[in-house]
């Protein structure tokens, strides 16, 4: 994200443990902002909610919640696809940038402060070992 490009729009972050009511609160916040003529969309920053079929164990937002407010990064990956902090950072930053460019307030919702911090701060994360090509000595 380009720093200070969208200084007039806030980025709201809701972080807390699984099943603590974050999704419901985020929907209420977005609906209230809409009433006040400030459109808002929810961006998932939870490392497990990105996976399809993990609804119960991750307290994935209900279909009703997802129909009430636009949600990004919910149930987008098959459970066989590895995810990482770097992938989530990239996908979520793209979603935040998209929202801000349309004048929409992004509401980040997740269980890990690390993931949310990686998205909103200037945090540089090295790739995982599985993504690094290691040369054999000759």
Where would I find each of the regions flagged by the language model?
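Hydrophobic anchor at the beta1->P-loop junction of P-loop NTPases
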Residues: 14
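ATP-binding Walker
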Residues: 20
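N-terminal phosphate/diphosphate-binding loop that engages ATP/GTP or pyrophosphate donors
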Residues: 23-108, 113-131
